[in-house]
């Protein structure tokens, strides 16, 4: 009787599992994509110094649009063609919806408690909805007002330094930092003096480097993860400690403010206020078993500080870099600004932005050549297949937006700065549906702050180019401006841009 019962249970189970096992076997028989041959056990670890967006783009030109690398027992796949990118970001985006976990990511995001690096699932969907609603939606009008006001302050700062060399990197970081702080934390940053700005810059840039570096310790067995031949683990601990104190002070300030203003129902709230309120409600509803904790709040604050500050700042610096290398494009966009806005007014309004066609082309061309995140990080949630190649579960997949934006099969003269290419009615847009141009990603893991970031980018550049003519210091020529990049998850300029503003308006700049 026991044998019969066993058969009754096992036969349906085997009939159910057999097709899945057969499919798994068929997948395993498929080859991996081409790539450089690795050594036994360690794979391609000795090539790790080539694994930035530029080095991977070169390897993809040799091995194709889907490249396979092996680091220890881990598989890495690099996507550098629009067709493969479409498969990853659109057709099978549910399969590639997780984020890879590294020692740096795990430690700097409080164990994956943030939004940007947590895995896809119910928690991620819930947090993204809150994130967008609390900070990035047009209904959250305070976020958009803060952009206008902080841009106007930066214009006044530049106006007070006319004729003097300005560090554009610091100017852009100060602006984007204050926009982010106003939108998320309710007030401009407390790091307004020069020394604190330098300190804040160093922290953000170190985070970017750590998020983007390949760490040998990530690709050895867990019992050997204490090995730190590159010194990255020590840097990770120091970086988190430097930022952790600031984030905790932000939370403490909001908790104290709430106590002081407990009875003031009309008091304006910011993102942190709303996160803390949501956290308290979760505790009540779930009887102290909450789905959102203080680490989640700290992780999201880290996301906003890093993503909201650095990406906009770097984009502003890169667009001015390219404009200074291309005087004819500077003249053309300033002629457009003169025609649309007029030299008798210094404010560029939203109604003007809609008509600044060539300015938008310049911004898109800058994002094509210098995408905010040159490598989009994904991880597979299950085994899958792309173009006849096997991609196993748990693999790291990197979409090389830098390579996509310079693909000669998609772009004519791809290395040249040519904003006019976007005047073509069928030119790619920023909606994430043209996979040769996805600077903010596409699909469910695309950048949630894209709209606010683009608005800040566009408004800042419009004002800087409308109010001032920019020239190079010390007799430099346009050809002397370099485009060498520094290391990091983003693409900072290795040597900060320095430029000299002169007024081009017929009216005074008055900022209330």
From Swiss-Prot:
Keyword Oxidoreductase listed: yes
Family annotation (PROSITE patterns): CYTOCHROME_P450
Main enzyme class: oxidoreductase
This protein's GO CC annotations: membrane
Binding residue positions for heme: 447
Protein name (Swiss-Prot/TrEMBL): Cytochrome P450 84A4
Further comment found in the protein's record: Arabidopyrones are derived from phenylalanine instead of tyrosine like other ring-cleavage-derived plant metabolites.
Its membrane topology: Single-pass membrane protein
Subcellular location as annotated: Membrane
Annotated CDD domains: CYP71-like (cd11072)
Species of provenance: Arabidopsis thaliana (Mouse-ear cress)
Transmembrane spans: 7-24
Cysteine disulfide links: none
Family: Belongs to the cytochrome P450 family.
SUPFAM superfamilies associated with the record: Cytochrome P450 (SSF48264)
Keyword Heme: yes
Domain of life: Eukaryota
InterPro entries membership: CYP450_84A, Cyt_P450, Cyt_P450_CS, Cyt_P450_E_grp-I, Cyt_P450_sf
Functional description taken from the UniProt entry: Cytochrome P450 involved in the production of catechol-substituted substrates needed for the arabidopyrones biosynthesis. Converts p-coumaraldehyde into caffealdehyde.
Tissue note: Expressed in seedlings, roots, stems and inflorescence nodes. Low or no expression in leaves, flowers, seeds and lignifying tissue.
Disruption phenotype: Deficient in arabidopyrones, but normal amounts of sinapate esters.
Pfam family for this entry, one: p450
Keywords: Heme, Iron, Membrane, Metal-binding, Monooxygenase, Oxidoreductase, Transmembrane, Transmembrane helix
Documented EC number(s): 1.14.-.-
């Amino acid at each position: 009787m026991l044998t019969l019962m066993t058969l009754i249970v096992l036969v349906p189970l085997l009939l159910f599992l057999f097709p899945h096992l057969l499919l798994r076997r068929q997948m395993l028989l498929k080859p991996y994509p081409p790539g450089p041959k690795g050594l036994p056990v360690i794979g391609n670890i000795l090539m790790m110094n080539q694994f930035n967006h530029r080095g991977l783009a070169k390897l993809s030109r040799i091995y194709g649009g889907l490249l396979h690398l092996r680091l220890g027992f881990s598989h890495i796949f690099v996507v550098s063609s629009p067709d493969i990118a479409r498969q990853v970001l659109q057709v099978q985006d549910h399969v590639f919806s997780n984020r890879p976990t590294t020692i740096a990511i795990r430690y700097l995001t409080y164990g994956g408690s943030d939004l940007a690096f947590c895995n896809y699932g119910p928690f991620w969907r819930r947090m993204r909805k809150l994130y967008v609603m609390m900070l990035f939606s047009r209904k959250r009008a305070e976020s958009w007002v803060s952009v206008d006001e902080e841009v106007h302050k930066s214009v006044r700062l530049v106006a007070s330094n006319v004729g003097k060399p300005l560090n554009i990197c610091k100017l852009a970081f100060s602006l984007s930092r204050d926009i982010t702080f106003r939108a998320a934390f309710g007030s401009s940053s407390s790091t307004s003096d020069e020394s604190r700005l330098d300190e804040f810059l160093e922290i953000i840039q170190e985070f970017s480097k750590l998020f983007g570096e390949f760490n040998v310790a990530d690709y050895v067995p867990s019992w050997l993860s204490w090995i730190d031949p590159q010194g990255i683990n020590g840097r990770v601990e120091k970086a988190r400690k430097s930022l952790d104190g600031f984030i905790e002070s932000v939370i403490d300030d909001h908790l104290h403010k709430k106590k002081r203003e407990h009875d003031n129902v009309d008091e304006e709230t910011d993102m942190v206020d709303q996160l803390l309120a949501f956290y308290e409600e979760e505790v009540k509803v779930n009887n102290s078993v909450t789905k959102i904790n203080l680490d989640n709040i700290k992780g999201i604050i880290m996301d906003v500080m890093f993503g909201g500050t650095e990406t906009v700042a770097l984009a502003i610096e890169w667009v001015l870099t390219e404009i200074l290398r291309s005087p004819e494009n500077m003249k053309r966009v300033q002629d457009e600004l003169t025609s649309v806005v007029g030299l008798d007014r210094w404010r560029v309004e939203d109604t003007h932005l809609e008509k600044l066609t060539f300015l938008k082309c310049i911004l898109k061309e800058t994002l094509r050549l210098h995408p905010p995140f040159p490598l989009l990080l994904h991880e597979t949630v299950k085994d899958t297949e792309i173009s006849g190649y096997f991609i196993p579960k748990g693999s790291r997949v990197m979409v090389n937006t830098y390579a996509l934006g310079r693909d000669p099969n998609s772009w004519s003269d791809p290395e040249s700065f040519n904003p006019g290419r976007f005047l073509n009615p069928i030119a790619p847009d920023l909606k994430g549906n043209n996979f040769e141009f996805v600077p903010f990603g596409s699909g469910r893991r695309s950048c949630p702050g894209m709209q606010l970031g683009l608005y800040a980018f566009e408004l800042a550049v419009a004002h800087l180019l409308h109010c001032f003519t920019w020239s190079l210091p010390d007799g430099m020529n346009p050809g002397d401006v370099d485009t060498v990049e520094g290391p990091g998850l983003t693409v900072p300029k290795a040597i900060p841009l320095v430029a000299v503003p002169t007024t081009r308006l017929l009216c005074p700049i008055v900022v209330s």
